[in-house]
């Protein structure tokens, strides 16, 4: 998983209505099982105790390991979703990710 950096990477997503929303990268990880990289995003400016929908995508990292909105791919396989949710739950259970 990527390290928590002082500088948070942000990505703009466009919904079906054409509205733009700014998201912060929560973390990224690579799955050897699927040989893919994943990125998890949260809306910008959320409070620590606020409940949010976390967005997850497959992405192809650039030379710096970063992602852009043009490179995000929907996850469509149920087993793949289960794996991503498992990684997310492990991340959320580790309090050190939020210090």
Curated annotation (Swiss-Prot):
InterPro entries: UPF0473. It holds the Pfam family DUF1292. It comes from the Bacteria. Belongs to the UPF0473 family. NCBIfam families: PRK13678.1-4 (NF010217). This is UPF0473 protein LEUM_0559.
